[in-house]
UniProtKB/Swiss-Prot annotation:
<comment type="function">
    <text>This is one of the proteins that binds to the 5S RNA in the ribosome where it forms part of the central protuberance.</text>
</comment>
<keyword id="KW-0699">rRNA-binding</keyword>
<dbReference type="InterPro" id="IPR020930">
    <property type="entry name" value="Ribosomal_uL5_bac-type"/>
</dbReference>
<dbReference type="GO" id="GO:0008097">
    <property type="term" value="F:5S rRNA binding"/>
</dbReference>
<dbReference type="GO" id="GO:0006412">
    <property type="term" value="P:translation"/>
</dbReference>
<dbReference type="InterPro" id="IPR029751">
    <property type="entry name" value="Ribosomal_L25_dom"/>
</dbReference>
<keyword id="KW-0687">Ribonucleoprotein</keyword>
<dbReference type="Pfam" id="PF01386">
    <property type="entry name" value="Ribosomal_L25p"/>
</dbReference>
<keyword id="KW-0689">Ribosomal protein</keyword>
<dbReference type="InterPro" id="IPR020056">
    <property type="entry name" value="Rbsml_bL25/Gln-tRNA_synth_N"/>
</dbReference>
<comment type="subunit">
    <text>Part of the 50S ribosomal subunit; part of the 5S rRNA/L5/L18/L25 subcomplex. Contacts the 5S rRNA. Binds to the 5S rRNA independently of L5 and L18.</text>
</comment>
<dbReference type="InterPro" id="IPR011035">
    <property type="entry name" value="Ribosomal_bL25/Gln-tRNA_synth"/>
</dbReference>
<keyword id="KW-0694">RNA-binding</keyword>
<comment type="similarity">
    <text>Belongs to the bacterial ribosomal protein bL25 family.</text>
</comment>
<dbReference type="GO" id="GO:0022625">
    <property type="term" value="C:cytosolic large ribosomal subunit"/>
</dbReference>
<dbReference type="GO" id="GO:0003735">
    <property type="term" value="F:structural constituent of ribosome"/>
</dbReference>
<protein>
    <recommendedName>
        <fullName>Large ribosomal subunit protein bL25</fullName>
    </recommendedName>
</protein>
Length: 95
């Protein structure tokens, strides 16, 4: 199963900005690795939450569309809420 998500570049940093994103149904994330600089991004929570239920989400290469540019990544780390079925933050590593 191929996964493809649309992402926006994240400009506001910090705890307050991250909380506002989560309250609006979005997840803060970061893409790093390779020769390019790390990029902070915003993803839709519901799309990611549904996709992460599939086992292949953790092993396959995922395509992120960031500002019209496709980036191939793999999930490096994922933080979940302690008792709610929600994602808090996700790290992607360029494939």
């Amino acid at each position: 199963m191929a996964f493809k998500f649309n992402a926006e570049v994240r400009t506001a940093q910090g705890k307050g900005a991250s909380r506002r994103l989560r309250h609006n149904g979005q997840i803060p994330a970061i893409v790093y690795g390779g020769s390019e600089e790390p990029v902070s991004i915003i993803l839709n929570h519901d799309e990611l939450n549904n996709a992460q239920a599939h086992e292949s989400f953790y092993s396959e290469v995922i395509t992120l569309v960031i500002g019209g540019k496709e980036v191939a990544v793999k999930v490096q780390a994922m933080q979940r809420h302690p008792f709610k079925p929600k994602l808090v933050h996700i790290d992607f590593k360029r494939a």
